[in-house]
Regions:
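Short beta-strand edge/turn micro-motifs at domain boundaries
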Residues: 142-155
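K/E-rich alpha-helical interaction surfaces of small helical-bundle regulatory domains
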Residues: 82-87, 109, 151-154
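Bacterial N-terminal signal peptides
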Residues: 8-18
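Signal peptide processing junction and immediate N-terminal pro/mature segment
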Residues: 21-23
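Early exported N-terminus immediately downstream of N-terminal targeting peptides
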Residues: 25-104
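Bacterial N-terminal signal peptides that target proteins for export
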Residues: 1-9
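Surface-exposed, charged secondary-structure patches
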Residues: 102-143
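Solvent-exposed, flexible loop/coil residues
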Residues: 70, 75, 112, 120, ...
Length: 155
């Protein structure tokens, strides 16, 4: 559980979620809550699904929730990104997707009464929205999770 918590913190803190289509239809909190609901569903069915099943379950959630192209640009650095070929860009985005899916499938591998709670939604710089949430563990401990959602095409 401790390894799962560390990964959750890193993933939630570092990744940007939301897509332009979702942002137009849902509030930032609703986008985050949909991600959390999917994670809980996967956790509750983790044993029956197995790793491969969890991967198949979470893959469309990851691609819908996370702006992987924007994350790739930020991870590589904008200066480096501009030097990549189209094939290299696609390869990096695919690698980020594979890593995200595998991480969620490996770390959310069971359910012990965990739940997510949205604490606040606040406007941030450049039209972004900051959503603060927490994961409550089965033992009652809480872990803060932070999300930054971008609007429009960057989103």
């Amino acid at each position: 559980m401790q390894r799962r918590i560390l990964i959750v913190i890193l993933v939630a803190f570092c990744l940007i979620i939301g897509s332009a289509a979702q942002a137009a239809e849902k509030s930032a909190s609703e986008v985050v809550n949909a991600l959390h609901a999917s994670l809980l569903e996967m956790m509750k069915d983790a044993d029956a699904l197995g790793f491969d099943g969890r991967s198949k379950f979470i893959e469309p959630v990851v691609t819908k929730s996370f702006n992987l192209p924007l994350i790739a640009v930020m991870a590589a650095g904008e200066k480096n990104w501009k030097t990549f070929s189209k094939a290299q860009k696609k390869q990096l985005i695919a690698a980020l997707e594979d890593l995200s899916v595998a991480t969620y499938a490996a770390r959310f591998d069971g359910y012990s009464g965990e739940n997510f709670r949205t604490l606040s939604e606040q406007p941030a710089d450049q039209g972004t929205t900051y959503v603060s949430t927490e994961l409550t563990q089965g033992d009652g401990g809480t872990i803060p999770l932070k999300y930054l959602l971008y609007p429009g095409d960057s989103g």
